[in-house]
């Protein structure tokens, strides 16, 4: 079937929402939001307020009685707050993982240890990784990069503690995963994770969340592509589900990832108020909106949110 829906101007977009039963108390607010946020982006949030579709349909395009544009904007803003808090937590976790890996590797193998391919798995493509670092260095105007170039003739690349300031979370995860077991296990335990394998899965999941958040994507009411690894000591805190062929696994709904972030943040930044701030944002949502994130009944009583 060929797509044939015509574009609508903003006043017509608002009228279409009214025709479908959405209450609009302030035309100015609604028109401004449609102009600055966009009809399509907001539609992911007002879908929650629509009547269930009839059999054979994907959407009803009719709003539940009492649903308002203001409720849609409130939900949109809650998701934005969650996204900002997620970026905050991942920043802390990424920096802690980076610092732990740098300290472990440099103390054991020296400041330029990452240049030695023998310290990493044979399937890591070490040479390709170094080429990517060289390319980043050539394009960088960071003060520490310029200083190293102007001051030292060799090695060509800066020490590990400088190099890691240039790499992404995804690249950091790859380097840690390629490290020998004893060292990466110590990194995992510094973040409160039981094993290097679990840490790798956690960093993979958090990297996906970081990318969604950095591109301003919706987190609320979304299934995260990468399922969290099973972490035995957290099973009473996570929401679990039966997965065909895999047994009981953590749900892919957002709540589980927020639980994990709260636990790691408590480990790497004990004085942080992040868990309680996230708990406040979630508690200000209605029960159905919390359920759409995967929040279990009674989640507020969990000590991690206090």
Where are the predicted features?
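Acidic/aromatic/glycine-rich contiguous surface patches that form carbohydrate-binding/processing clefts
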Residues: 216
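Extended intrinsically disordered or low-complexity regions, especially N/C-terminal cytosolic tails and loops
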Residues: 1-208, 220-306
């Amino acid at each position: 079937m060929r797509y044939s829906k015509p574009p609508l101007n903003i006043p017509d977009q608002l009228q279409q929402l009214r025709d479908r039963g959405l209450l609009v108390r302030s035309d100015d607010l609604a028109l401004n939001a449609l102009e600055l946020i966009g009809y399509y982006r907001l539609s992911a949030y007002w879908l929650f307020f629509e009547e269930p579709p009839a059999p054979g349909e994907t959407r009803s395009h009719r709003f539940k009685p009492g649903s308002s544009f203001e409720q849609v904007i409130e939900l949109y803003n809650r998701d934005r707050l969650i996204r900002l808090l997620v970026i905050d937590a991942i920043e802390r976790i990424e920096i802690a993982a980076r610092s732990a890996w740098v300290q472990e590797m440099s103390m054991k193998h020296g400041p330029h240890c990452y240049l030695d391919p023998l310290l990493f798995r044979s399937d890591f493509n070490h040479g390709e990784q170094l080429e990517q670092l060289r390319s980043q260095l050539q394009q960088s105007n960071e003060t520490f990069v310029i200083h190293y170039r102007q001051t030292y003739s060799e090695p060509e690349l800066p020490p590990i503690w400088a190099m890691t300031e240039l790499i992404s979370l995804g690249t950091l995860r790859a380097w840690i995963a390629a490290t020998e077991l004893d060292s990466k296990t110590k990194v995992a335990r510094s973040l409160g994770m039981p094993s290097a394998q679990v840490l790798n899965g956690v960093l993979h999941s958090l990297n996906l969340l970081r990318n969604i958040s950095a591109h301003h994507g919706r987190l609320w009411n979304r299934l995260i592509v990468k399922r969290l690894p099973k972490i035995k000591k957290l099973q009473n805190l996570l929401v679990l589900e039966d997965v065909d062929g895999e047994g009981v696994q953590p749900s892919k709904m957002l709540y589980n990832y927020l639980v994990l972030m709260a636990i790691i943040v408590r480990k790497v930044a004990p004085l942080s108020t992040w868990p309680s701030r996230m708990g406040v944002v979630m508690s200000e949502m209605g029960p159905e909106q919390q359920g759409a994130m995967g929040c279990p009944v009674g989640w507020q009583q969990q000590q991690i949110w206090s």
